[in-house]
Every structure is written in C-alpha cells, then in structure tokens.
Amino acid sequence: MSNQHILLVSSLLPVGSNISTWWNFGSMLLTCLMLQILTGFFLAIHYTANINLAFSSVIHIMRDVPYGWIMQNLHAISASLFFICVYIHIARGLYYGLYLNKEVWLSGMTLLVFLMATAFFGYVLPWGQMSFWAATVITNLLTAMPYLGTMLTTWLWGGFSINDPTLTRFFALHFILPFVIISLSSIHIMLLHNEGSNNPLGTNSDIDKIPFHPYHSYKDMLMITTMITLLFLILSFSPNLLNDPENFSKANPIVTPQHIKPEWYFLFAYGILRSIPNKLGGTLALLLSVVILTTAPFTHTSHTRSMIFRPLSQILFWTFIATFITITWTASKPVEPPFILISQTTSIFYFSFFIMAPLLGWAENKIMMLNN
C-alpha cells in the first residue's frame, strides 16, 4: 500500500481517463476536513467547556476575538458543506455501483458513523437552547436499549441528567474524533487505490489510464475552488442561513422548545425516528437508516455494475433521492398532520429502495436475456 503513496507523490498514480465531476467529491471532503480541524483548533483555544460559561465563550469568540466571527461561521457552514459533499459522495457510490469494492465501501460507512458522532457532539457545545434539548432527546434514546440502556445513558451524561460533566466529555470527544476520521480517511484512500477507482461506465479501466496529476488534480482544484467560493458567499451574505434561531438563546432546562430538532443534515434519520410511535422501534429505525447502506454490496444482483444503462433502476434511485429530501423537509416541521403521514410514507419508501434495488436488478437481467 505504501507504493500507492509513492505513486501519488511522484504524480504517476494511474486513474481512469473517463471519471466525471462526481469523482471530485473525495478531494472536496478532504478540504472540508482540513478546514474543520484548522478552524476548530482556533475555536477550542477560546472555548470554555462549562455549562455556565460555554454560551458566553461563544459570544466572546464572535464579538471580541479578532476574526473570531469568521472562524465560528466557517466552522459551522463548512460542517454543512461537509455533509452535502458526503451525501453526494454516497449517492454517487450507489448510482455507479462503487459499493462492489467492499473494503472501500465499508470503510466509508465507518467514516460516516464517526463523522455523524463528531457533528452531533459539536452541535451540543455552544450550549444553546436547541443544543441542550437535541442532546437530551438523542442521548435519551439509549435508554430504549434493554438491560444496558439506563446504565449507558448515565455513563454518557456523567450523572442523572445532562450537566457539566456531559459538556466536558462531549468537548473531549468532539476534539479527538476528527483525528480518528483522519486515520480512517487514510485507510479509505489506501484501500481505494489498492484496486483503483472505477468509472461511470462500470467497466474495467486498466486499458485506458492516465496520471492523476496534472489531469485529475486540476479538475479537483476547480471543484474545490467552487466549493470555497460558495462557502465564502454564504459566510459573507447569510452566515446564519443554516443555523437554528432557537440556538441563539442560552440553554434552559425549564423551558422546552416548541419543536426539538437536530441539525438539518441529521433530519432524514430524525424523521424516520419520529415516524414510528414506539421508542425502541424508532431507535432501531434510526440506526438502520444509516446501517442499511452497508447491505448494498451484498444485495447487488444486476450483471451491470453501474445504473447508467439501467433505466428502471435509475427511476428507483431518483425516487430514493426525492424521498431523502422529503424526509428531511418533514422532519423540520412540527409533529402534526399532514407531516406525520408524509414522514411515515417516505420512511417506508426510504427502506423500500434497499429491497427493490436487488429485485429490479434481477428483473433487468431477465429483460436483457430476453432481448438477447
């Protein structure tokens, strides 16, 4: 595997000549990760992990620290862009059948779990009203686990409710997990270049490969520049576009917000959780909404790797994307009709994709055999 690094540094890493823009999101994710670690380091210098001082320390960063407002907003906005890139990266993998490279796909899924955990811990740190209540609701789901649930929740909280020890350990976890993500990213990249990246056609690219640099590195730079431009546009004109207004108030355990919800990038999983009126069932569905992605390499039935030549699978895929967006939208709304019904329907559609995709693959094989 070390040979891959030597090839990369010496600009000789062979890559398929026909990979499209959808293959640029990996480098964009690495850029986001570096940006998050840099801005996070400067924020950690001024942040105080204490329930009485956390909210004030964030205000101090925004108002008194030179360029603190840039650091804080860059950290928050690039977290959102990070997840946009992650979801596009995963969707690309599903569409082009890249999950058939099992080691890369499963290491990517592990990365996703750590990324979601890191983002959740980070959301709690400002100790705003929504931070506190989102942490209370989500961590309380652990109590649904039989036998061990209550003990695990008490251990995570560091007491019998969310308090100072909870914030301290969340800050420690939020600081250390990005370094775990760096390690996993290195493994992910090494595993990818061990076999080589696939291409939109889903065919073997061994006969037509070109050096990564300068051909694909310049293409990566274009997309990274586009992403950073978008980041600074949001930062300059609407820095609070993706923030929750409720989080501008200090955490108050006495007053419950009218509608508790996590950050927008977790709303799809939260929508699935909320659509099941049973605590244990909802918690299992929440876990399954992410874990089910690991089944993709084992349920692939089509003789064709990519969906590019499979119109029926394409319809199913875009229905899945529409479902994902709809769940996210309904989860941002209060728990009332018609959002309850829409949420339940889209949750069924979400899981149906992973059942229907292998069946459609099998059906398409039969259709192709009939045509031949």
Curated annotation (Swiss-Prot):
It holds the Pfam family Cytochrom_B_C. GO terms for cellular component: mitochondrial inner membrane; respiratory chain complex III. The chain crosses the membrane at residues 25-45, 69-90, 105-125, 170-190, 218-238, 280-300, 312-332, 339-358. A ubiquinone binds at residue 193. It is a multi-pass membrane protein. Gene3D superfamilies: Cytochrome Bc1 Complex, Chain C. InterPro entries: Cyt_b/b6_C, Cyt_b/b6_C_sf, Cyt_b/b6_N, Cytb/b6-like_sf, Cytochrome_b, Cytochrome_b_C_euk/bac, Cytochrome_b_N_euk/bac, Di-haem_cyt_TM. One of its GO terms (biological process) is mitochondrial electron transport, ubiquinol to cytochrome c. The keyword Transport applies. Keywords: Electron transport, Heme, Iron, Membrane, Metal-binding, Mitochondrion, Mitochondrion inner membrane, Respiratory chain, Transmembrane, Transmembrane helix, Transport, Ubiquinone. GO terms for molecular function: metal ion binding; ubiquinol-cytochrome-c reductase activity. Binds 2 heme b groups non-covalently. SUPFAM superfamilies: a domain/subunit of cytochrome bc1 complex (Ubiquinol-cytochrome c reductase), Transmembrane di-heme cytochromes. Heme b b566 binds at residues 89, 188. It is found in: Mitochondrion inner membrane. Heme b b562 binds at residues 75, 174. It comes from the Eukaryota. Its main location: mitochondrion. Its cofactor is heme b. Component of the ubiquinol-cytochrome c reductase complex (complex III or cytochrome b-c1 complex) that is part of the mitochondrial respiratory chain. The b-c1 complex mediates electron transfer from ubiquinol to cytochrome c. Contributes to the generation of a proton gradient across the mitochondrial membrane that is then used for ATP synthesis. Heme 1 (or BL or b562) is low-potential and absorbs at about 562 nm, and heme 2 (or BH or b566) is high-potential and absorbs at about 566 nm. Belongs to the cytochrome b family. The cytochrome bc1 complex contains 3 respiratory subunits (MT-CYB, CYC1 and UQCRFS1), 2 core proteins (UQCRC1 and UQCRC2) and probably 6 low-molecular weight proteins. This is Cytochrome b. It comes from Hemachatus haemachatus. The gene is MT-CYB.
